[in-house]
């Protein structure tokens, strides 16, 4: 990637002098800057633009880092092969005529992919504009622009859109750290670029225009890794695109691409925006270290009508208007005219001077119910727009609550906006735009907060017996079925700790009567058929049966009705089920396989109207308690189940338990293509799955990897093992979990000064919640932390931690080990380092390294015994390194 994006030598394959040609434009862009050597390649020319032209890349006398290919598509595979033989590691294919041209073009892409794998080169494109990096004077594109250096990395899959935005940015004096057009993304994709610019010190924020994600697992891993430190802003079109596949389940029908992408972006800490016009505004404001802690906005305005417009925009976008406290109203009374609005929006009236504005803003800032302030100015009254702007800038510098401004009008307002722009304070010409920006800030902060939340520990069985269930699925497929019946689906749920209503599948009326008498009236009858997914649609459900006579009548009527409506369907029997006498709420909990992001989980309002109300949210497994709660909170039905019109509130903790258990089931079973629990019924404090259906993915039965259906690596239970210290004390070695934050905090707080300095190279008195969360909530693809857990009489505690963090090139990893003072010299440090070496081997790393205090003789001795080389460094440090391959 370094050769690709920071080359010293570049070959332009297809260079020409023809005016207006791509080959000439690319060459002119590259030679405009003298920082690197550029070699034209064209077998038909001896010279191009006064430079020697080479017939092939193999004739160039030096090693080339980057080749830019601008020749016809049919000749590209052979040229990529030639580049590979010449040792060229980076290639940009600008040429078009690949998959966008049909099957023949797709075949050319497949050839290039095989060649790329053979030589290990990295390729951007094909069908792209190229790459621009202003800070290093690299313009390997055919765009006739040279953007100024800046702090925004803009990556676009669409060349036309990328070109237009770049042109607009040039006019608006916006600079870039990088512009890249990715085209068809046969190799380098968004995940690769995020990794690269995430490590780039010139990049402060990352903007993406995405049509397709590429490697979703790589994208999620990269985005989660850098979203904490650099805002990632995404535009992904296709909000109303319907899935081309006919879904069997409600979940499959509802959870479309838009919702799945939305869930992925939230999980990664990425902010999604809807309009291109918002891209650069979002990039600027999201860098702010002061993001709103909540959605509640106070509006201070000198025009009541504009305040109403701002309020409408806020409510339409699901924001909240702050309810000012009685104390705030009282304080405002002392500063406002007698006939002021006495509420939010705070109308300071048209004759307001600067002091009245300032007093209103300060009162709102001191109100705990205010998370941010929108200040609106219209050109009237005594307040001069530029002087008022300067006072607001002073206030904004002293508060952690964001202040956004709207200066409406022409020349006078422009003077105030200039003050804000000079001082990096968000300012807009319309209240709608300002409100939208505030809510982007809130959503981004909320997404980041999710990364920092510590989940509560739930008593969910993390490893229930499952192999007999996999045998059940295999038998089902062998029978020629891909749809589990209700009873089989409930078997999966029950074994994972999810409460289900018991069903009796009966073959005749006598069996049905016996089952009803055993379970007790009232009962429900449901048709059982491998050909019928939605029973209600064919009249296949009868409720409220209270007697033997009623059951006899309804049993026969049920079968006749279904045969009339679905004469081709095979009827396997009739299910008899105890009926809930009162259902307070009906929910749906389901899963489906998305073509890009693997299996996703859906929660929402259930029942027969589930696809009409469409009140649901989507999340990516695996889920913990925090993520389960967030999944519920994003629906309207969550407010209802808090208690509604005399109905009792649901047991939210039990629902969290059920959702996490369901997530575990989905993680363990790649064989599940779609699954619905509908309804998941709540009656008082009781929760039960009344109906369930499961669609099997036959292809997944032969999958070599148990987690290919997931884009977020689940908890790596294979590293869990009991182990004894030298003194015989037994500990549990296992990967760290987000729930471990309290135990890690306790361990760090009880360490000696020497132990802390040995790990952190400085005296550390207090570690923030955010940092502890970062230590515990890790991406198991890119990092591993093994903890030693000691179980004492009434509690568990951590006594040691070994960690390896993998570099973004996935070739090496840095390790560190910390053992509690009370448990040193007992073999634990040696064991942790050895486990980290094994993990590095498994992940295919080439080397493991660490930085150790030279005075830490014990750790250096362990490293030498395990085969590390030790090299002294300045400042009393030593570098230890172990080459694995």
Task: Show where each model-derived region lies.
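Catalytic-core regions of core metabolic enzymes
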Residues: 1-691
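Generic detector of short, aliphatic-rich beta-strand segments that form the cores of beta-sheets
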Residues: 689-694, 878-880
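Long, contiguous binding/interaction regions
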Residues: 698-885
């Amino acid at each position: 990637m370094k050769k690709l994006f920071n080359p010293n030598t570049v070959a332009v394959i297809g260079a020409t002098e023809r005016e207006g040609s791509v080959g000439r434009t690319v060459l002119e862009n590259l030679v405009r800057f003298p920082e690197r050597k550029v070699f034209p390649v064209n077998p038909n020319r001896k010279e191009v633009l006064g430079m020697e032209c080479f017939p092939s890349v193999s004739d160039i006398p030096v090693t080339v880092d980057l080749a830019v290919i601008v020749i016809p598509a049919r000749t590209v595979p052979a040229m990529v092969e030639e580049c590979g033989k010449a040792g060229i590691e980076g290639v940009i294919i600008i040429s078009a005529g690949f998959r966008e041209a049909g099957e023949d073009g797709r075949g050319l892409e497949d050839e290039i992919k095989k060649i790329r794998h053979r030589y290990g080169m990295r390729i951007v494109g094909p069908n792209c504009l190229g790459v621009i990096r202003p800070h290093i004077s690299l313009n390997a594109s055919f765009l006739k622009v040279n953007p100024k250096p800046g702090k925004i990395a803009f990556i676009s899959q669409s060349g036309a859109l990328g070109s237009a935005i770049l042109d607009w940015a040039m006019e608006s004096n916006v600079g870039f750290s990088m512009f890249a057009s990715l085209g068809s993304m046969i190799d380098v994709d968004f995940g690769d670029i995020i990794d690269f610019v995430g490590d780039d010190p010139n990049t402060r924020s990352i903007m993406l225009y995405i049509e397709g994600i590429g490697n979703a697992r790589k994208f999620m891993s990269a985005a989660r890794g850098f979203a904490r430190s650099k805002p990632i802003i995404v535009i992904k079109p296709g909000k109303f695109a319907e899935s081309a596949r006919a879904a069997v389940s409600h979940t499959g029908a509802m959870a479309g691409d838009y919702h799945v992408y939305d869930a992925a972006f939230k999980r990664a800490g990425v902010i999604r925006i809807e309009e291109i016009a918002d891209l650069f505004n979002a990039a600027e404001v999201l860098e702010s270290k002061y993001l709103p802690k909540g959605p509640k906005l106070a509006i201070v305005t000198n025009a009541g009508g504009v305040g109403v417009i701002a309020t409408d925009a806020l409510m339409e976008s699901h924001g909240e208007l702050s309810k000012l406290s009685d104390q705030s109203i009282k304080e405002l009374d002392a500063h406002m005219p007698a006939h002021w609005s006495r509420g939010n929006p705070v109308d300071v009236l048209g004759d307001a001077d600067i002091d009245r504005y300032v007093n209103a803003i300060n009162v709102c800032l001191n109100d705990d119910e205010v998370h941010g302030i929108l200040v609106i100015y219209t050109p009237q009254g005594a307040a001069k727009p530029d002087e008022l702007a300067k006072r607001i800038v002073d206030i904004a510098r002293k508060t952690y609550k964001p202040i956004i401004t709207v200066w409406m009008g022409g020349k006078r307002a422009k003077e105030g906006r200039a003050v804000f722009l000079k001082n990096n304070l968000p300012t807009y010409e319309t209240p709608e735009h300002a409100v939208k920006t505030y809510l982007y800030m809130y959503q981004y902060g909320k997404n980041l907060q999710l990364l920092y939340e510590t989940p509560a520990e739930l008593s969910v069985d993390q490893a229930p017996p499952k192999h007999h269930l996999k045998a059940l699925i295999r038998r089902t497929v062998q029978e020629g079925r891909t749809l589990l019946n209700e009873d089989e689906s409930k078997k999966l749920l029950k074994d994972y700790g999810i409460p289900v209503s018991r069903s009796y599948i009966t073959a005749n009326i006598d069996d049905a009567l016996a089952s009803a008498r055993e379970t007790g009236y009232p009962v429900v009858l449901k048709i059982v058929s491998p050909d019928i997914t939605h029973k209600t649609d064919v009249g296949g459900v009868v409720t409220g049966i209270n007697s033997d006579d009623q059951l006899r009548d309804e049993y026969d009527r049920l079968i006749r009705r279904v045969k009339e409506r679905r004469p081709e369907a095979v009827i396997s029997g009739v299910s008899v089920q105890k009926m809930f006498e009162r259902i307070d709420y009906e929910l749906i909990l389901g899963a489906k396989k998305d073509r890009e992001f693997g299996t996703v989980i859906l929660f929402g309002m259930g029942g027969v109207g589930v696809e009409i109300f469409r009140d649901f949210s989507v999340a990516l497994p695996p889920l913990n308690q925090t993520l389960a709660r967030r999944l519920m909170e994003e629906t309207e039905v969550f407010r209802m189940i808090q208690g509604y019109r005399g109905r009792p509130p649901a047991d939210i903790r039990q629902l969290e338990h059920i959702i996490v258990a369901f997530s575990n089931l989905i993680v363990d079973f790649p064989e599940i293509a779609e699954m619905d629990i509908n309804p998941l019924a709540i009656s008082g404090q009781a929760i039960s799955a009344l109906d369930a259906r499961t669609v099997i993915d036959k292809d997944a039965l032969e999958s070599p990897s148990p987690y290919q259906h997931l884009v977020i690596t689940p908890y790596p239970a294979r590293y869990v093992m009991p182990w004894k210290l030298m003194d015989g004390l037994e500990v549990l070695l296992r990967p760290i979990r987000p729930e471990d934050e309290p135990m890690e905090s306790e361990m760090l707080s009880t360490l000696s000064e020497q132990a802390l300095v040995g790990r952190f190279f400085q005296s550390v008195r207090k570690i923030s919640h955010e940092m502890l969360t970062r230590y515990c909530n890790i991406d198991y693809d890119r990092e591993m932390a093994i903890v030693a857990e000691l179980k004492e009489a009434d509690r568990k505690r951590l006594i040691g931690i070994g960690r390896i963090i993998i570099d973004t090139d996935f070739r090496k990893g840095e390790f560190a080990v910390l053992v509690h003072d009370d448990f040193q010299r007992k073999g634990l440090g040696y064991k942790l380092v050895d486990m980290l070496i094994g993990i590095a081997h498994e992940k295919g790393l080439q080397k493991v390294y660490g930085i150790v205090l030279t005075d830490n003789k014990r750790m250096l001795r362990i490293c030498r015994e395990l085969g590390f080389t030790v090299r002294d460094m300045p400042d009393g440090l030593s570098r230890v390194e172990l080459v694995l391959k």
